[in-house]
Amino acid sequence: MSKLFIAVLLGSLLAIPAAAQTGQQSGAGSANPLSTWLRNAYMGNRNTIVRSAEKMPEENYGMRPGTQQEVRTFGQQVGHIANYNFLWCAQAKGEKNPNAGTNLEKLNTKAEFLKALNDAFAYCDGVYSSLTDASGTEMIDITQESGRQTRNLRMALLILNFAHNNEIYGNIVTYMRMKDIVPSSSEPRPQQQQPR
């Protein structure tokens, strides 16, 4: 996980000067290029995950890609994303996890999983929307899954959350492809009208 985190962080930092050179940064983004990039990346990933979870039929929420019971079902993958969005965004906010003690991987229906996912993303949306480059570089206390206490940059934790969402979305894509369902990130994009 740490190699993935470092790769995402370095990719983020390298993308900023390139975006600035091509004129993609403007307004508030030019004052906060790191947090603007992260917010936009998170929102794109968030929307892709929600659309894919909505697109998967209810009967496939219990499927696994094989016979191994330790591999999460599609629904459990959705619940896993919700669990970690609550955990890491609560820590980034400096709040108690509003979902503490509840394992969203143990839900039963598509409607329950979608509600948990949307609630978790709604909770995180405020964290990402209020993030600035300055607030992102503040050191915060973090409790890891093992219970170990550590300190890290707020933005580092939110980059980890984004990267983890992306990692689990990769699993979701596999489940969808196994059922011959086109994931939302691969859907055809509407053609834009060309000026005449």
Place the predicted regions along the sequence by residue.
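N-terminal secretory signal peptides that target proteins for export/translocation
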Residues: 1-2
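Bacterial N-terminal signal peptides
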Residues: 5-17
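Boundary at the C-terminal end of the N-terminal hydrophobic targeting segment
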Residues: 18-22
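Short N-terminal segments immediately surrounding and downstream of signal-peptide cleavage
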Residues: 23-47
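Short, contiguous alpha-helical
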Residues: 39, 43, 47-50, 61-102, ...
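Well-ordered alpha-helical scaffold segments within catalytic/enzyme domains
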Residues: 48, 52-53, 89, 123, ...
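Short, flexible helix-adjacent loops and helix caps
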Residues: 57-61, 93, 129, 133-136
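Acidic/histidine-rich alpha-helical segments that form the ligand environment
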Residues: 106-143, 150-168
